[in-house]
Curated annotation (Swiss-Prot):
Entry protein name: Protein NrdI
SUPFAM superfamilies linked: Flavoproteins (SSF52218)
Protein family per UniProt: Belongs to the NrdI family.
Lineage: Bacteria, Pseudomonadati, Pseudomonadota, Alphaproteobacteria, Hyphomicrobiales
Pfam families listed in its UniProt record: Flavodoxin_NdrI (PF07972)
InterPro entries: Flavoprotein-like_sf (IPR029039), RNR_Ib_NrdI_bac (IPR020852), RNR_NrdI (IPR004465)
GO terms assigned for molecular function: FMN binding
GO biological process, one term: protein modification process
Disulfide partners: none
Function according to Swiss-Prot or TrEMBL: Probably involved in ribonucleotide reductase function.
PANTHER family (UniProt xref): PROTEIN NRDI
Amino acid sequence: MGLIVYYSSATGNTEHFVSQLGQRFFKIDKKISSALVYEPYVLVVPTYADGEGRKAVPKPVIHFLNEVENRKLMRGVIGGGNRNFGRNYSLASKIIAEKCSVPCLYNFELRGTDEDVICVKKGLEKFWKQ
């Protein structure tokens, strides 16, 4: 199974979701976002957009992905968000998927549901076998 790389804010929603997956993970640190990973991974990222969709991708994630090696090893992205934000729901994952030419594998709301966790576990298992 591959590595999960994630970023989580003070709400801890993304961190909670990732912790339920039972897989190895690496947290992008707000203070040391230029860290490198050395194996293929799936990125799990929340969305922080204003009403116009600006600044959807958290700055530490941008810094992390500015490292060429980190971009090369990303195999997919999973997005967290809040459906109350309508068209901006999980916007960060869509932006990253498009800019980095990787698939957006799944989107979950807030902390995710038990069903989300099951779907992502099964989906990642299948994804890493490809």
